[in-house]
Amino acid sequence: MYQEEIVIYARTRCRQCRRARRILKRRGYAFEAVDVGGDEELSARLVETTGKKEVPLIFLGGRLVGGLADIEALERSGDLDRLVRGRV
């Protein structure tokens, strides 16, 4: 798996994934987008390490932040900026 500061594991045609990417872009965060569509090995490793089968999965500094609902909640509360600023 990638070790960029912010990494989003997603699928190209996933509506929730597009929403999560838009949030990160709107906040001005640089991130690495990794398409897991068709990569069964990577998908299996993500499930093994996170226990989650759905995407998007957003990592910050190699640690799982969560999925779309988590990013939306962090953005609403203002904690997303604090979390990212503490890492970047």
Model-flagged regions — what are they?
Residues 1-30:
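Local sequence-structure signature of Cys/Sec-based thiol-disulfide redox active-site neighborhoods
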Residues 14-17, 40, 65, 74:
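Loop/helix-junction capping segments adjacent to catalytic residues or to phosphate/diphosphate-binding pockets
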Residues 19, 27, 35-40, 70:
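Positively charged, proline/Ser/Thr-rich regional signature most characteristic
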Residues 21-24, 48, 71-74:
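Short, glycine/charged-enriched secondary-structure capping and boundary segments
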Residues 27-30, 43-55, 59-65:
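Structural alpha/beta surface segment adjacent to cysteine/selenocysteine redox centers
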Residues 35-53, 79-87:
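Thioredoxin-like thiol-disulfide oxidoreductase module
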Residues 60-88:
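Non-catalytic, surface beta->alpha helical segment in thiol-disulfide oxidoreductase systems
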